[in-house]
Structure formats: C-alpha cells, structure tokens
Amino acid sequence: MTTSINADGKGPKKESLWASTGGQGEYAPPVRNDDTLVLRIRDLRLATYSGTEILHGVDIDLYRGEIVGLVGESGSGKTTAGLAALGHVRTGLRITDGTVTLHSRDGETTDVLSLSEDEVRDMRGSRVAYIPQDPALSLNPAMRVGDQIREVLDIHNFGSSSSERAERVREVMRDVDLPDTDEYLARWPHQLSGGQQQRVGIAMAFAMYPDVLILDEPTTGLDVTTQNHVLKTIRTMTMKNDVASLYITHDLAVVGELVDRVIVMLRGDIVEEGPYNAVLYNPKHAYTRKLLGAIPDLEGDRDIAGNDRWDNSWAEVHGAPAASAEAPLLQVRDLEMAYGDNTVLHGIDLAIEAGESTLLLGESGSGKTTLARSIAGLNPGYTGDVLLRGAELAHSSRDRTLEHRKDVQYIFQSPFSSLNPRRTIGESMSVPLVMAGELSRAEQRDIVEETLEAVQLDRSFYDRRPGDLSGGERQRAAIGRALVNAPSVLVCDEITSALDVSVQASILRLLAELRYERGLSLLFVTHNIALARHIATRVAVLNKGVIVDDGPVDDVLDNPQHEYTRSLLANIPSL
C-alpha cells in the first residue's frame, strides 16, 4: 500500500485504500457543511493548576464520513485536544476557556464541557468512542471477546431484546473482518494477535453507532501488513457508519494513506491545517516540513540517519564488513526456544560480522524479541548455540564471563527497563562498571561523563533523573548505559518504536555515528521495514519463529525470496 503522486505533481491519489474499502471511482473529499458538522471545538484552552497554559485556543471541526489526522510530536498537545472531545481532562490540568459542541445524528446538540460526570459516562462509548494505542487498555484480559462487545451494548441499553444485542455483536465482528462464530467470540484477548485485538477494539467502538471516533495512535507497534488491515477497517467503518473520526498520530506516512484532512500541532498551537495533499505535499510551516523530512523511506533517499558517512568513511578506515573465512563476530546456530508446548523459535541460524548492522524484522509474535533476549543471555531456556568470536556463550548472562557480558549489551524498548527512576542518570549508567569491579569511583564517573558526551548529552545529565528527561534523551541515556563497558555488539530491541519521527531520526543518526566511531556491530530489532536502508547493512526477516529471508539490505528489499517479505514490502505506507 503506497501513496502515489499525481501526474501534475500536486499531490497523491488514494486509489489503494479508497478502492479497497469500497470507494467508487476516484477519491473525493467528504462534504463539509452545517448539515454534516458533528463536533466543533472552539478556543479550547487548558492549563496546569499552577497557571501554565498547555493548549492556546485550539479550533477543530469534524464532519461526517471524514477522517482528520491530528499530527504532532510528544508534548504538542494533540492527545490533550483529542481527549477533550470525550469530555476528559488529564490529571493536573483544567479547562480555562473554550467550548466543545457535539451535534448528534438524532438532531441533539450537546455542550460537552457542561455535562455532569454521569452524562459524560453515558456519552462515551455511545455518542463518542475512543480507541487507545494499546488494545490491552480497552480489552479486559479476564473477559471473553464477545462478552466485551456485549457489555458495551448492555451498558448503553442497545435495542429492545437480548437477541438484538447478540446479533449486533456478530454484525460488528463481521464489519471488522473477524469471525462471528461462537468459538471465536468465546476466545480470550491473549489468544488473539495484536492486529486482531485492535480490530476487536474497533468493533467495540462502533457497536453503538457513535457520531465521533477518537483514535489515539492505534497502529503504533503493528507490522505494516497488520497496520494495513487496521487502517482499511477504520476507513471502511468510517464510511459505512458516516462517523467523524479524529486520528491522533505522529506518523505522517500513515496520515498520507488514511485521512482526508490534516491538522498539525506544535506546543499547544495549530500551526497548519488543510486537505491532506496540500499539507503533506506543499507544507507551509517549517515544523511540518521538519516532520516530513524525518520520515524513513524504504528507498533510503532521505538521509535521516547519516548513513552516507558510514558508507563512505568507515569502510575506508576500518575495512568494510564482509563475510570472513574466520568465524563471524556473533553467530547463532540452530537456536530453538519454547514456552511449555509452544515452540516460538525453530532452528535459527544467524551471523553478524564485525562492524555490521543487521535489522531483525518481524511482526508482534514473530519471536524477534525472544531471539534478541536469548542472544543477550536474558532467555536462558533455549537450545542451540550463541557464539562470540567462535567461543560459545553461556545461555544465561549470569553464567557468562565478565568479558562476554561486557561484549554483548542489550538495549530495552523502554528506557525505564535500564534506568532506575529513583537514581540519577549517572548512577544508573555506572551500574555495569560497578558490577565489573575494575575501576575506582572517580574513574567510573569519568567514563560515564565521556559516554554521555558520546551519546550527545551534556555531562550535567549525570545528576539528573529519568523523569526530568524527554523520551529521546532517556533513550540516549539507555544507549549510553550499554556503551560504558565498550561492547562489541549492541542488541537494540524496538528502541525507536515509541519515539516521534524526528527523535527516531536523531537516534538512528547517533547509532550510525557510534558504528562509525567505534566499529560496533548492531542487531536492530524492529517491526518497521522502512528503517532498513537507514540503519542496516543486512536484513533478517522472522516469521512465526523462522527466518524466511536473510541477506544484504538491497538483496532482500529488491528481490525478496519469501511471500511474507513481499507482503510486508507491498503494504508499507509512504509519502
């Protein structure tokens, strides 16, 4: 699924998603007038109780059958503005001015901000529905799938009989392209894939025929094929139910595929607004241009990670990474891993040369994190071998030699997995040095401060705490913690998946520079195939615990051998 450019160069055509979701002929924008207006936000201002203003007079209109992309990075105020449509204000904030007016399909007009708590609860899920980023937040793990949708109907007194509600459950399951069988409705959430869970969440949101749908980054973390299915479902359900949808995201590539109109927010202000093709292909504001310039593209034409420096310089100085007659730096041989009777990795073979960056690609449930953790000694229950410079590594990191522990370092998806919120950054980064027991405290501090500079943080960050840092700064500190013992291999587990595109680009640039300067080898675990040419020299594609494609980046992307890889490539959203 890609977004093509019109012959006149003025913008994209949406044939792929438009046609695949039932649109007839060429894409045409929804009608916007007083009759189709559903939600109007005017001069909305929110502030902290100390008086700091967070939203500075935001105006948003939503119309029936339209999807509006509300775009911005962390701290832009996009989620705060979107949640106001639900009558929700985050703890510590208060509305100081403005109105939120809902025009229901039954002809009623509602002042959302004047509703009582009971009235707001009644409105949510019936007139205004919400789909969170993580389906686990909308699905009760202790309730069967069908019962959860039925509960929404029961709470809002849908229909006149139990049989009518039961039929509505089956109808909405069919609408989101999931089975409506008794067996499927009786499943538990953990028995569904991430994409299936998200589609159940969409079914719950549409069960009561809402007027407005608020979607808060609902495809973050999904592989591109699953993301494509979810986006099609959102588009289909919006068109079929004549709903006004607000899609909150930092992913402009997804916006280009899905929405009719784009609103860009920066620090509590709307800085640009217009039809999707005008904003994405002829942006007026510098911030919009910055966001667009940071989107990773499969072709690698945008140099978001500084890879030209790697290609031209590292090989000249250190020698290009290439298959060696000797043992590779890191080698995985016939690795298998099972949880009880469930085998999640099937005979994995993988090799990483010195200075090489391998992108390990897979969807949720593919086994990629299990493999990464096994390599790092964090999943000791595997069979098979992991070797470093030809020497077999103990299965558990605790049983590995000090040199082996120092040589292979793991960076978690969440920086808080390695940064203790009660410790300063310097104290957390010092832990590997303390455990090694080879340096004085003064020497440890010197190394930590030098490493802070290496990850482009000031030495003053030594005395700051994780909660005081932005998401990108915390991830840099987590990378620094992995670097203090001068490893040869960094295992990076989805470390940019939760970051804004510009912050992601800065982390990719940092990793490229570290490889250039230190000759590091990387195993970069991700579900995002568009990052391949920006971070990797090789790609290994993992599907259901089996590596189905493996080779140099250009070979895998230009000539994929497996249908799964071809499917991923066909479904990449792009601009």
For each of these PLM feature ranges, what is it?
Residues 94-110, 384-392:
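Conserved ABC transporter NBD signature motif
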Residues 107-129, 155, 278-283, 393-409, ...:
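ABC ATPase NBD coupling module
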Residues 86, 90, 376:
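Helix-to-loop junction immediately C-terminal to a conserved catalytic motif
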Residues 273-274, 550-551:
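ABC ATPase "signature
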Residues 188-192, 196, 465-469, 473:
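Conserved ABC ATPase signature
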Residues 164-183, 443-460:
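Conserved ABC ATPase "signature" region
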